């Protein structure tokens, strides 16, 4: 029985010890364990696999993906980072720039501004095309000139009072429709995601006048096309108390973990510790600094339970980004199967 439990732990748990981590590699492949049928089976996979949405708001999404291998989870994360397309500034035509910011630095800053535009409604620009069209390009104009405020107090030293337009923000970017874009996109839908991103600072007489072309691209080509601010995953924590912890030791145990992980209850007049919500733990391993309590707790992670956190830049809602990443992954699988079929035919 003990041997069976040890094997099951090796197969399903990554165990964190005081001086190292055990069972870090996936070992449940066919033939590795006697008495276990680890051959891949689609029906069994469909039965065990699930996705649970834990939290979603305008720009962030947390969900659990259960029943998959680390390779698939990481492929999904990499697709979110680098292969879901967005629109971003690609070309900057500078007519006049007398600010302290050099042209190339200014163009780089503009490229990193997230653009609120659905990339699914646009095509990739053909390589070598210099002039954009309404199906592959968005055009923005930025024209700001700094002047002195004639109504400012004489003894004022506040730039906000002394100067007009001395800070250039993304709100100064004006969308210029190409072709029939004005009919396709209502006013206000094509814009920078945030209107308060500082681009440059000016002083009286300085001016920025330029034209921007936004095109469709992916983060694999340049980070400015990445649709997510963060896309990460972690394994679900699994915390087990190996023996009862009571009295002051229970309070001490709860302080060794993140708030909400260990709960102290009153049972028959005694304080008793129990694991309330291991999901909240950050695995600081503070428990191993306590000589009395480190032997009564087992810290582990569930090998096939991934907690995904996706934070959108605001270009698209996070649930849309996840669905688009799934489509990209499915497309990769189809191409792989097509390649296999082509090899078999040859």
Curated annotation (Swiss-Prot):
- Looking at the keywords, is Nucleus present? yes
**What does the entry list under GO cellular component?**
cytoplasm; cytosol; fibrillar center; nucleoplasm; nucleus; RNA polymerase I complex; RNA polymerase III complex
Q: Which InterPro entries match?
A: DNA-dir_RNA_pol_30-40kDasu_CS, DNA-dir_RNA_pol_insert, DNA-dir_RNA_pol_RpoA/D/Rpb3, RBP11-like, RNAP_Rpo3/Rpb3/RPAC1, RNAPI/III_AC40, RNApol_insert_sf, Rpo3/RPB3_RNA_Pol_subunit
Disease annotated for this entry: Treacher Collins syndrome 3: A form of Treacher Collins syndrome, a disorder of craniofacial development. Treacher Collins syndrome is characterized by a combination of bilateral downward slanting of the palpebral fissures, colobomas of the lower eyelids with a paucity of eyelashes medial to the defect, hypoplasia of the facial bones, cleft palate, malformation of the external ears, atresia of the external auditory canals, and bilateral conductive hearing loss.
Subunit field text: Component of the RNA polymerase I and RNA polymerase III complexes consisting of at least 13 and 17 subunits, respectively. Pol I complex consists of a ten-subunit catalytic core composed of POLR1A/RPA1, POLR1B/RPA2, POLR1C/RPAC1, POLR1D/RPAC2, POLR1H/RPA12, POLR2E/RPABC1, POLR2F/RPABC2, POLR2H/RPABC3, POLR2K/RPABC4 and POLR2L/RPABC5; a mobile stalk subunit POLR1F/RPA43 protruding from the core and additional subunits homologous to general transcription factors POLR1E/RPA49 and POLR1G/RPA34.
Family affiliation: Belongs to the archaeal Rpo3/eukaryotic RPB3 RNA polymerase subunit family.
Q: What is this protein called?
A: DNA-directed RNA polymerases I and III subunit RPAC1
This chain's source organism reads: Homo sapiens
- Originating gene: POLR1C
């Amino acid at each position: 029985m003990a041997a069976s439990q040890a094997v099951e732990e090796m197969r399903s748990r990554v165990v964190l010890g005081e001086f190292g981590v055990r069972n870090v590699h996936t070992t449940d492949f066919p033939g590795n364990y006697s008495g276990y049928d680890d051959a891949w089976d689609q029906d069994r996979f469909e039965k065990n696999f699930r996705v649970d949405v834990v939290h979603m708001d305008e720009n962030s999404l947390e969900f659990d993906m259960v029943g998959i291998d680390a390779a698939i989870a990481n492929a999904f994360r990499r697709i979110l980072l680098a292969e879901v397309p967005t629109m971003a500034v690609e070309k900057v035509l500078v007519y006049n720039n007398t600010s302290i910011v050099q042209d190339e630095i200014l163009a780089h800053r503009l490229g990193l501004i997230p653009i609120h535009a659905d990339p699914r409604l646009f095509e990739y620009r053909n390589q070598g095309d210099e002039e954009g069209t309404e199906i592959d390009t968005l055009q923005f104009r930025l024209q700001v000139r700094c002047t002195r405020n004639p109504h400012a107090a004489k003894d004022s030293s506040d730039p906000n009072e002394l100067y007009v337009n001395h800070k250039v923000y993304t709100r100064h970017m004006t969308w210029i429709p190409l072709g029939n874009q004005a009919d396709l996109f209502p006013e206000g839908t094509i814009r920078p995601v945030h209107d308060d991103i500082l681009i440059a600072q000016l002083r009286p007489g300085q001016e920025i006048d330029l034209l921007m072309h936004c095109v469709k691209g992916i983060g694999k080509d340049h980070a400015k096309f990445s649709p997510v601010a963060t896309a990460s995953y972690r394994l679900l924590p699994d915390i087990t108390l190996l023996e009862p912890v009571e009295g002051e030791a229970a309070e001490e145990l709860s302080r060794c973990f993140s708030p909400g992980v260990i709960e102290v209850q009153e049972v028959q007049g005694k304080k008793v510790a129990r694991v309330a919500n291991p999901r909240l733990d950050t695995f600081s391993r503070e428990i191993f600094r306590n000589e009395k309590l480190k032997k009564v707790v087992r810290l582990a992670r569930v090998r096939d339970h991934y907690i995904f956190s996706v934070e959108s830049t605001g270009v698209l809602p996070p649930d849309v980004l996840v669905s688009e990443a799934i489509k990209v992954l499915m497309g990769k699988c189809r191409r792989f199967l097509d390649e296999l079929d082509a090899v078999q035919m040859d």
